[in-house]
């Protein structure tokens, strides 16, 4: 068995032919640059590109296959220059009868299966070239379609206040999905504003593995959350086994941001912008008295929880708080570039490179910042209302 760093939720901004795929997303994010960034800079060994429903993205992937840069693996997924495995995914929006919208991810093994899925979904999605579009279907129906295509189905950023399963659609999985279809869900993506400790307070989620992914819309965001997975090889089939914890394949560890860094962790007044915990405010802003509140993930999970804090299934992987390197005070772009060029990828810097080497190349302040990442000593200023939290070094 081998261990790999994996980020299964990365977006393409624009195709090489100049067509926008995901708006708003950096135009620097093409299929090719995602793979190059993962390989040369990030050290992420498995990437999920979740815009492969788009024919423009399929065209770019096919071009790389024709060039010999991507090679189809025997278990599905494509190997890029023998260093990064590409898993094809599709983020799709659904809508419940009451108006709540949800984003979900469907992963498939190769271009042929993704093209088949895309052709079917084009009957529901008006512009199949753009990613994350509304399929004008309820969550249950998309689960059924994905299951018919043998896709790995994952609810995305499951608790965020906008366009997520528990954030805007339902109070329970059972209310939108019959028991017979529960096994069609391969895993649940936590999102940047939640962690394992929070999600495990909801008992019906104990049957599922959790994914911590970046949902990257720009190159520097790749790997801001990631997973360490145990696989025989970095193929689609092996990932499918790990998602379901079968045959000794598994998610070994989740590396996610402290939820307080997420931009939807706390409540936010939609009128004055105050970020605050719910407390006993009854939905009224304690600052301006406004009654329109964006409910944060922390409060939402508190509403759904049926278990006390600190309870977990015995097989739940460890969750490690990770600070994305661009968020570290005193670690500017030029300093990080120098560290990567001289000492290795970001994964190597975070997990392997001695602090003495970091200090030698970038100075004492940078070494202190990396020390804070590794031992969790940084102070966090909570985010909310669409604004990320901040890291404060002692």
Language-model segment annotations:
Residues 1-99, 356, 373, 377-379, ...:
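An N-terminally biased module of ancient metal coordination in phosphate/nucleic-acid-related enzymes
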Residues 13-15, 49-58, 95, 160-164, ...:
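Active-site environment of divalent metal-dependent phosphoester hydrolases
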Residues 6-10, 47-48, 86-90, 153-155, ...:
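Hydrophobic faces of well-ordered beta-strands that scaffold small-molecule active sites
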């Amino acid at each position: 068995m081998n261990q790999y760093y994996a980020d299964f939720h990365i977006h393409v901004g624009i195709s090489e032919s100049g067509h926008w795929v995901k708006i708003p997303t950096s135009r620097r994010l093409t299929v090719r640059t995602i793979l190059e960034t993962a390989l040369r800079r990030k050290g992420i060994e498995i990437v999920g590109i979740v815009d492969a429903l788009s024919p423009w993205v399929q065209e770019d992937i096919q071009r790389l296959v024709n060039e010999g840069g991507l090679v189809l693996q025997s278990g599905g997924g494509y190997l890029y220059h023998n260093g990064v495995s590409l898993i094809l995914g599709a983020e799709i929006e659904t809508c419940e009868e009451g108006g709540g919208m949800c984003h979900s991810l469907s992963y498939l093994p190769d271009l042929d299966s993704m093209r088949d899925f895309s052709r079917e979904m084009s009957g529901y999605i008006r512009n199949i070239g753009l990613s994350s579009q509304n399929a004008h279907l309820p969550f249950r129906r998309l689960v059924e379609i994905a299951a018919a295509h043998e896709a790995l189905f994952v609810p995305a950023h499951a608790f965020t206040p906008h366009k997520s399963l528990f954030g805007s659609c339902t109070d329970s999985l059972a209310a939108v999905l019959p028991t017979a279809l529960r096994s069609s869900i391969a895993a649940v993506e936590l999102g940047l504003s939640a962690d394992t400790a929070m999600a495990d307070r909801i008992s019906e989620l104990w049957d599922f593995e959790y994914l911590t992914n970046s949902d990257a819309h720009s190159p520097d965001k790749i790997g801001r959350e990631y997973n360490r997975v145990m696989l025989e090889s970095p193929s689609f089939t092996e990932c499918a086994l790990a998602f379901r914890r079968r045959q000794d394949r598994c998610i070994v560890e989740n590396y996610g941001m402290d939820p307080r860094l997420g931009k939807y962790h706390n409540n936010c007044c939609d009128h004055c912008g105050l970020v605050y915990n719910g407390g006993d405010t009854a939905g009224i802003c304690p600052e301006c008295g406004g009654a329109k509140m964006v409910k944060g993930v922390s409060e939402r999970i508190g509403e759904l929880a049926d278990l006390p804090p600190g309870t977990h299934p015995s097989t739940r992987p460890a969750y490690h708080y990770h600070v994305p390197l661009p968020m570290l005070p005193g670690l500017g772009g030029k300093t990080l570039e120098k560290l990567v060029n001289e000492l290795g990828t970001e994964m190597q810097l975070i997990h392997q490179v001695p602090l003495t080497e970091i200090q030698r190349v970038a100075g004492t302040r940078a070494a202190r910042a990396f020390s804070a990442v590794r031992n969790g000593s940084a102070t966090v200023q909570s985010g909310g209302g669409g604004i990320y939290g901040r890291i404060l070094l002692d």
